[in-house]
Amino acid sequence: MIKLENLTKQFVQKNGQTFNAVDNVNLNVPEGEMCVLLGPSGCGKTTTLKMINRLIAPSGGKIFINGEDTTDLDTVTLRRNIGYVIQQIGLFPNMTIEENITVVPRMLGWDKARCKERATELMAMVALDPKRFLNRYPKEMSGGQQQRIGVIRA
């Protein structure tokens, strides 16, 4: 579960004025749900995501993951346990689809069989046949198919 309470990010511009990039965002994403931040360019979507995974610090407000305030969490552990998809798909072109999907599980020490099982399960969730696609490379898939891989990798 992700909960944002009055999340704010302000930047000081060159002229000394303060710019509110994110202004008191409140959001609840229940466990197991996907959430889409949709809006025009420059409205704070990416800034909000960067605050959730602590690439940048909020100016105000709180971020909770599974009920725990993330302020004092270890950033490496935090980032390994959350994922998000950005507009740019960001698949590794030199890795197969299976390797792309299992990057984080392999970093966490999962064995090969468990990784394969999880990749197969995730492929089925996005209506892509694992037998057809797991051994392919991103360039061998359409943009929409690649985007789905990005979603399940997150």
Language model features with spans:
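The feature captures the beta-strand-to-loop junction immediately N-terminal to the Walker
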Residues: 38-40
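Helix-to-loop junction immediately C-terminal to a conserved catalytic motif
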Residues: 53
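ATP-binding/catalytic-site motifs of ATP-hydrolyzing domains
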Residues: 62-64, 68
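ABC ATPase NBD coupling module
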Residues: 69-83, 107, 112-113
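Short helical segment in ABC ATPase nucleotide-binding domains corresponding to the A-loop/adjacent helical element
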Residues: 98-106, 116, 120
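Conserved ABC ATPase signature
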Residues: 136-141, 145
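Hydrophobic anchor residue at the start of the ABC signature
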Residues: 151
